Amino acid sequence: MLKQVSFIFFLVFSCYKGAESQELKHLTNELQVNVGANRVWELYRHLGISRLTAEQLPNVIQNIQVLEGDGGVGTVLKLTFVPGNSSYTERFIVINDEKKVKVAKGLEGGCLAIGCSVQIVQFDIIEKRKDSCIIRSDIAYAVKKEFEANDPKPNIQLLAAAAQIAKRFLESSEK
């Protein structure tokens, strides 16, 4: 167990070091869901939340493609946005079932296309009670020195919308 936690810490730390020792900024969204954490984690753990969000937001996401993998660590996922001229590609680098944490590192697109040197997306499913939890979505990012004056930021709205979609989907299926 200690080895797993140490490895996860090392992996996340290595990604943060990829920001060339720049200070990481964070955008965070939290949403309470009246469903147990295990049910929410089932949706977030692999590709379920990406597929559900694409299905529910066809005016935002044109399609999703799995470029590598099966939804586990190492999976590379590409989201193409409407009207199809922009995209975002990420690699799942941590999936921790015990802590219900999923981390993805941006590879291209998103804020990387407008001046960020690193973009790391993390989902934490935090149990509150047996039938309630919090979906915490966090984007950590660093801005390249030459773009600091422009203050580029990733957009957390899609992650917030995905959490709302998950909430509606899971709470309605509980009834």
Mark where each language-model region is.
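A short, structured loop/turn motif at beta-sheet edges
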Residues: 37-38, 69, 93-101, 124-134
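Intrinsic-disorder/low-complexity, polar/charged segments enriched in Ser/Thr/Lys/Arg/Asp/Glu/Gln
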Residues: 24-30, 61, 74-76, 87, ...
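Beta-strand/loop substructures that line and gate deep hydrophobic ligand-binding cavities in soluble
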Residues: 103-161
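Hydrophobic pocket/interface hotspot
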Residues: 40-44, 77, 92, 104, ...
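Hydrophobic ligand-binding cavity/cleft-lining segments
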Residues: 2-70
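Hydrophobic/aromatic beta-strand elements that line small-molecule binding cavities or substrate pockets
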Residues: 29-31, 88-94, 118-127
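Short amphipathic alpha-helical signal-transduction/dimerization elements
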Residues: 48, 160-175
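Glycine-rich portal/gate segments that line the openings of hydrophobic small-molecule binding cavities
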Residues: 51-55, 61-112, 173
